[in-house]
């Protein structure tokens, strides 16, 4: 048996199937393309679903891939078992109606016995209990003895997910030997012990399951196989754990070095090391595919993995950002196959570091909250933190549950784990409710996928704004209908159209479908499967029927406004890269007739000077009236001429290029102006952060920009009229007013301080002694919180030793301030608890430090009652 590394096994597999006339398809990005049912690519077959479902034509009948995958369903097991990981690679060979069982199994056997040189006597196979064909291939054609072919039932060897394509499967197993077994004489594949390792599953998609549970033979059966690369590496390298294979070991050793930890000395330490090793691979590859940390969707998965890894670094004694330092090792081991790790390495490191540093702040914030909870438990003489509070720490502040538990245990306290789990289940249910209708593997079809594949639309709208088309299909209320009457809404599919379907961030066209007998308002246009263009319509006049010939007329005003904004996004993208840096990539966009929104990768807000430069640069290109050219070319040639691609996007072999003069070159399928001068004017409205490492610009062009300037001019003129000055003098006049106001504020504050100082003498005369401590409790009239604090500071300085509690009502609001000198605090006084309890009586709350605190209330009538309790609370504090 050969001893091959991960990269060598991958290369052997792909080259073997290249020799079997398979197209070697590069791994798809982890972000599913055109598939809203999946959060992340989680299997080798997932990116190929459109081919298996017949929605798209595959590039060839035979394909082979090595697909990067992310799964987090068993995240709690990662690092604690030998085989669980969040990132893994799936090797697979696929046939779309070409070869079937015989070729799939015989080639599989050839690869593992000839290329990998696995010992024949160590190999077993399983087949579906009723699949005699597969059994015969294994036994008669390949020569595997009957006793090493195991028939298993539907749960093990039949692949199906709800309705649709399904079929039996056959798996190849490796026998690790009796030392790994359960000792049972009947031990064989299918046993729960660790002796037999399944490493290659061959799925024979030969049936179509209907709603009644009947299985109908498919006219063109498919092959879908999957081999876990890490699992095969374990076999080839003779190790028991995926964390001991070559690529993982290289990263793991770096983890040990950075964290000053030793592997295989302590199991708790080992778990943390393994979690970091696994998670940093997932994190790096996700960011490399354009995913960024956020609080929802795949961004939340990334954030959770990153923070979990950082948390385990903290358990190993690392109290700084460190994960980003491991990206070099990930790129060294995986960068040859996944070049985005190398191309975007600095960017990946920057995103990780920023998120790590944010998490460090979160941990500190969470500790402050947890300490407050602990303080409350001690005060109330309780020992169990509620599940609600533990969940709030976890959900709101990102504070890990196990860290909360550990800290509580150190202080002799515990937490209500049942209550915490109850809150977690409520959150899971909310997530499930939000996912209703989305199948786990994403095989659910809509009404349009079931239409005849011949129903396709030829898009003619790049150069035409009105074309004639024939109605091929009408869908109303999720039902295919023959006609649609006046007043009703439907989706209409034509054989030809000028309407652009929503895509690439650009909204769909609106307009009219009409002939002499019927008129339909097109409210929106969307792309559908099988090259369909969906016209979302309302029938204004007549009845639309299948077979009708209509004219499809795009609304020119909105189309041109959208085109201006779309071309402007290209100019903006290039200007950002010129002025801010080459690290800027498009992270998303929205192009509408009214405005454009452009998300880009960057880690800090743009300066005023940068914004000015960007706006000027874009407007310069507009004034230069550059020709806008579009053409189709190969993806390789597009890259050679420097065409910018969307970060994390997957493109076909032929792409559409949009060039604005010699200034901007991008891959784009949208509609554009023919000359940059048609944009007219470009104005940035705002620039802000939307996620870690992602900024957003909103801007306007054309008439919207002109109206904006006009409105601002009118506003400035009105300000000038109000200030009784000329427009050119407005800024100077406002600056004078601001200066005058500040001077008056200073005078007012000075007078307030004098009044406060003068009034403190009378207040101090009312001081009483409680437990040997001077205490001042006083109600003052109409004082804001700042004023109360100033008076409190003066009193604290004059009293020398003691406690001051002041209250004041202002309209419907109550303010409280409490202060205590150092010696009073040392005797047990806690200003925060004093003011918190007092504020409760006045319908409010608050708190703070032992020496200074403030609170608010909503019931001015209770202010005196609240302050009357202060001395009683003080006595209790001193007696504890």
UniProtKB/Swiss-Prot annotation:
<dbReference type="InterPro" id="IPR012947">
    <property type="entry name" value="tRNA_SAD"/>
</dbReference>
<dbReference type="GO" id="GO:0006419">
    <property type="term" value="P:alanyl-tRNA aminoacylation"/>
</dbReference>
<keyword id="KW-0820">tRNA-binding</keyword>
<dbReference type="InterPro" id="IPR023033">
    <property type="entry name" value="Ala_tRNA_ligase_euk/bac"/>
</dbReference>
<keyword id="KW-0694">RNA-binding</keyword>
<dbReference type="InterPro" id="IPR018164">
    <property type="entry name" value="Ala-tRNA-synth_IIc_N"/>
</dbReference>
<feature type="binding site">
    <location>
        <position position="570"/>
    </location>
    <ligand>
        <name>Zn(2+)</name>
    </ligand>
</feature>
<comment type="function">
    <text>Catalyzes the attachment of alanine to tRNA(Ala) in a two-step reaction: alanine is first activated by ATP to form Ala-AMP and then transferred to the acceptor end of tRNA(Ala). Also edits incorrectly charged Ser-tRNA(Ala) and Gly-tRNA(Ala) via its editing domain.</text>
</comment>
<dbReference type="Pfam" id="PF07973">
    <property type="entry name" value="tRNA_SAD"/>
</dbReference>
<dbReference type="InterPro" id="IPR009000">
    <property type="entry name" value="Transl_B-barrel_sf"/>
</dbReference>
<feature type="binding site">
    <location>
        <position position="566"/>
    </location>
    <ligand>
        <name>Zn(2+)</name>
    </ligand>
</feature>
<keyword id="KW-0648">Protein biosynthesis</keyword>
<dbReference type="GO" id="GO:0002161">
    <property type="term" value="F:aminoacyl-tRNA deacylase activity"/>
</dbReference>
<dbReference type="InterPro" id="IPR018163">
    <property type="entry name" value="Thr/Ala-tRNA-synth_IIc_edit"/>
</dbReference>
<keyword id="KW-0067">ATP-binding</keyword>
<dbReference type="Pfam" id="PF01411">
    <property type="entry name" value="tRNA-synt_2c"/>
</dbReference>
<dbReference type="InterPro" id="IPR045864">
    <property type="entry name" value="aa-tRNA-synth_II/BPL/LPL"/>
</dbReference>
<dbReference type="InterPro" id="IPR018162">
    <property type="entry name" value="Ala-tRNA-ligase_IIc_anticod-bd"/>
</dbReference>
<keyword id="KW-0862">Zinc</keyword>
<dbReference type="GO" id="GO:0005829">
    <property type="term" value="C:cytosol"/>
</dbReference>
<keyword id="KW-0547">Nucleotide-binding</keyword>
<dbReference type="InterPro" id="IPR003156">
    <property type="entry name" value="DHHA1_dom"/>
</dbReference>
<feature type="binding site">
    <location>
        <position position="672"/>
    </location>
    <ligand>
        <name>Zn(2+)</name>
    </ligand>
</feature>
<dbReference type="GO" id="GO:0004813">
    <property type="term" value="F:alanine-tRNA ligase activity"/>
</dbReference>
<dbReference type="GO" id="GO:0005524">
    <property type="term" value="F:ATP binding"/>
</dbReference>
<keyword id="KW-0436">Ligase</keyword>
<keyword id="KW-0479">Metal-binding</keyword>
<dbReference type="InterPro" id="IPR018165">
    <property type="entry name" value="Ala-tRNA-synth_IIc_core"/>
</dbReference>
<dbReference type="Pfam" id="PF02272">
    <property type="entry name" value="DHHA1"/>
</dbReference>
<feature type="binding site">
    <location>
        <position position="668"/>
    </location>
    <ligand>
        <name>Zn(2+)</name>
    </ligand>
</feature>
<dbReference type="GO" id="GO:0000049">
    <property type="term" value="F:tRNA binding"/>
</dbReference>
<keyword id="KW-0030">Aminoacyl-tRNA synthetase</keyword>
<dbReference type="GO" id="GO:0140096">
    <property type="term" value="F:catalytic activity, acting on a protein"/>
</dbReference>
<keyword id="KW-0963">Cytoplasm</keyword>
<dbReference type="InterPro" id="IPR002318">
    <property type="entry name" value="Ala-tRNA-lgiase_IIc"/>
</dbReference>
<dbReference type="GO" id="GO:0008270">
    <property type="term" value="F:zinc ion binding"/>
</dbReference>
<dbReference type="InterPro" id="IPR050058">
    <property type="entry name" value="Ala-tRNA_ligase"/>
</dbReference>
<dbReference type="GO" id="GO:0016740">
    <property type="term" value="F:transferase activity"/>
</dbReference>
<protein>
    <recommendedName>
        <fullName>Alanine--tRNA ligase</fullName>
        <ecNumber>6.1.1.7</ecNumber>
    </recommendedName>
</protein>
<comment type="similarity">
    <text>Belongs to the class-II aminoacyl-tRNA synthetase family.</text>
</comment>
């Amino acid at each position: 048996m050969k001893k091959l590394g991960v990269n060598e096994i991958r290369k052997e597999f792909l080259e073997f199937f290249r020799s079997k006339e398979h197209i070697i398809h590069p791994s798809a990005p982890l972000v599913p393309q055109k598939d809203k049912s999946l959060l992340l690519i989680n299997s080798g077959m997932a990116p190929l679903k459109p081919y298996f479902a017949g929605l798209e034509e595959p590039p060839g009948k035979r394909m082979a891939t090595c697909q990067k995958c992310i799964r987090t369903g068993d995240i709690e097991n990662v690092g604690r078992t030998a085989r669980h990981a969040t990132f893994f690679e799936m090797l697979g060979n696929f046939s779309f109606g070409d070869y079937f069982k015989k070729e799939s199994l015989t080639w599989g056997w050839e690869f593992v016995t000839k290329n990998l040189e696995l010992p024949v006597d160590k190999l077993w196979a399983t087949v579906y209990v009723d699949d005699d064909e597969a059994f015969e291939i294994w036994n008669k054609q390949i020569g595997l003895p009957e006793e090493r072919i195991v028939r298993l039932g539907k749960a093990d060897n039949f692949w199906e997910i709800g309705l649709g394509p399904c079929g039996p499967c056959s798996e190849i197993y490796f026998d690790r030997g009796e030392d790994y077994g359960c000792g049972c004489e009947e031990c064989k594949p299918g046993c729960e012990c660790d002796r037999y390792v399944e490493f290659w599953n061959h799925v024979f998609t030969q049936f179509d399951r209907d709603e009644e549970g009947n299985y109908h033979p498919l006219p063109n059966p498919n092959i879908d196989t999957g081999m876990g690369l890490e699992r095969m590496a374990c076999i080839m390298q003779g190790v028991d754990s995926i964390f001991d294979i070559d690529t993982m070991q290289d990263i793991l050793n770096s983890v040990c070095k950075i964290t000053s930890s030793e592997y295989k000395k302590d199991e708790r330490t080992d778990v943390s090391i393994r979690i970091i090793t696994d998670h940093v691979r997932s994190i790096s590859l996700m960011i490399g595919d354009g995913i960024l940390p956020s609080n929802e969707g795949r961004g939340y998965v990334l954030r959770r993995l990153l923070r979990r890894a950082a948390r385990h670094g903290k358990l190993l004694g690392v109290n700084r950002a460190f994960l980003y330092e491991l990206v070099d090792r990930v790129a060294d081991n995986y960068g040859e196959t996944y070049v985005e790790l190398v191309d975007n390495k600095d960017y990946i490191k920057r995103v990780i570091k920023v998120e790590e540093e944010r998490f460090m702040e979160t941990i500190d914030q969470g500790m402050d909250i947890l300490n407050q909870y602990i303080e409350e438990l001690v005060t109330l003489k309780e020992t169990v933190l509620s599940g609600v509070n533990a969940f709030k720490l976890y959900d709101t502040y990102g504070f890990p549950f196990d860290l909360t538990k550990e800290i509580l245990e150190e202080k002799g306290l515990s937490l209500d784990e049942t209550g915490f789990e109850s809150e977690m289940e409520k959150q899971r249910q909310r997530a499930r409710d939000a996912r209703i209708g989305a199948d786990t593997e994403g095989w659910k079809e809509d009404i349009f996928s079931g239409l005849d594949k011949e129903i396709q639309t030829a898009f003619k709208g790049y150069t035409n704004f009105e074309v004639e088309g024939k109605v091929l299909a009408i869908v109303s209320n999720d039902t295919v209908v023959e006609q649609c009457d006046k007043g009703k809404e439907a989706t209409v599919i034509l054989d030809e159209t000028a309407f652009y379907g929503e895509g690439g961030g650009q909204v769909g066209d609106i307009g009219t479908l009409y002939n002499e007998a019927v008129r339909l308002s097109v409210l929106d246009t969307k792309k559908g499967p099988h090259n369909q263009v969906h016209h979302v319509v309302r029938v204004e006049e007549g009845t639309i029927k299948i077979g009708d010939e209509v004219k499809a007329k795009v609304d020119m005003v909105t189309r041109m406004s959208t085109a201006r904004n779309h071309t402007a996004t290209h100019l903006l993208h290039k200007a950002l890269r010129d002025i801010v840096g080459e690290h800027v990539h498009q992270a998303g966009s929205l192009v509408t007739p009214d405005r454009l929104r452009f998300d880009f990768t960057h880690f800090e807000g743009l300066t005023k000077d940068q914004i000015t430069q960007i706006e000027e640069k874009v407007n310069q290109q507009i004034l230069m009236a550059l020709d806008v050219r579009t053409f189709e070319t190969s993806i390789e040639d597009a890259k050679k001429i420097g065409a910018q691609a969307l970060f994390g996007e997957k493109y076909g072999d032929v792409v559409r290029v949009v060039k604005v003069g010699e200034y901007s070159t991008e891959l784009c399928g949208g509609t554009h102006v023919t000359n940059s001068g048609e944009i007219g004017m470009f104005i940035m409205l705002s620039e802000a952060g939307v996620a870690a490492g992602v900024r957003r610009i909103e801007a306007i062009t054309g008439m919207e920009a002109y109206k904006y300037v006009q409105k601002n001019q009118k506003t400035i003129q009105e300000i000038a009229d109000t200030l009784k000055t000329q427009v050119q003098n407005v800024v100077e006049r406002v600056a004078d007013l601001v200066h005058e106001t500040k001077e008056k504020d200073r005078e007012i504050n000075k007078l307030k301080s004098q009044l406060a100082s003068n009034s403190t003498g009378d207040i101090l005369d009312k001081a009483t002694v409680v437990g040997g401590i001077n205490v001042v409790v006083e109600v003052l009239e109409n004082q804001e919180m700042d004023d109360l604090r100033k008076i409190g500071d003066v009193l604290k300085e004059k009293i020398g030793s003691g406690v001051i509690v002041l209250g004041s009502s202002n309209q419907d609001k109550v303010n409280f301030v409490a202060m205590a000198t150092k010696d009073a605090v040392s005797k047990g006084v806690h200003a925060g608890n004093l003011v918190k309890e007092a504020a409760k009586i006045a319908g409010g709350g608050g708190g703070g430090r032992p020496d200074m605190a403030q609170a608010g209330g909503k019931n001015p009538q209770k202010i005196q009652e609240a302050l009357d309790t202060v001395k009683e609370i003080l006595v209790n504090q001193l007696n504890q």
